[in-house]
Amino acid sequence: MSVYQTYKGLPAGWVAQWDPTYQAYFYINETFEGAQPQWEPPIPGLHIPPPPGTTTVVYQKDVPRSSDGSRSMTAGLGGFMVGALAGSVLRGHRAYYAPPPPRGPLFGPRIGGGHHGPLHGPHGGFGGRGGGRMGGRGGRGRR
């Protein structure tokens, strides 16, 4: 897997790396050891065009739901996997892992609709807001 990086328009020591999942650049200050990648450019309002040959897709307002109505985990895992697999080197430069998924009006809501509970177990999961309640009765059985 190849990685697209550029230094165009960036301050000395900064590199922009394209994330194909979010169709956006993330930025790293290479002058500091252990610098964390970030979605915000080091210069406010900086615009770097997408890599050559990139086809961009218009942002979809909501995460697609499966047939049972739950939100798909595929989109969130896709960004993680792309970042994890981006360990290849392009033109002798170091490739970086993407930061956590972007937030804000440019990128839309986070996967899971703001649910901050555990992502495992029989009743949690993505979109698992029921907490084990059956039929809207609070899990107390028949009355």
Curated annotation (Swiss-Prot):
Origin: domain of life: Eukaryota
Q: Region (Disordered): which ranges?
A: 115-143
Disulfide bridge positions per record: none
Q: What is this protein called?
A: WW domain-containing protein C660.05
Q: Where are the transmembrane segments?
A: none
**Residue ranges occupied by any WW domain in the UniProt entry:** 9-44
Q: Which residues form a coiled coil?
A: none
| InterPro entries the UniProt entry points to | WW_dom (IPR001202), WW_dom_sf (IPR036020)
| Cellular component terms (Gene Ontology) | nucleus
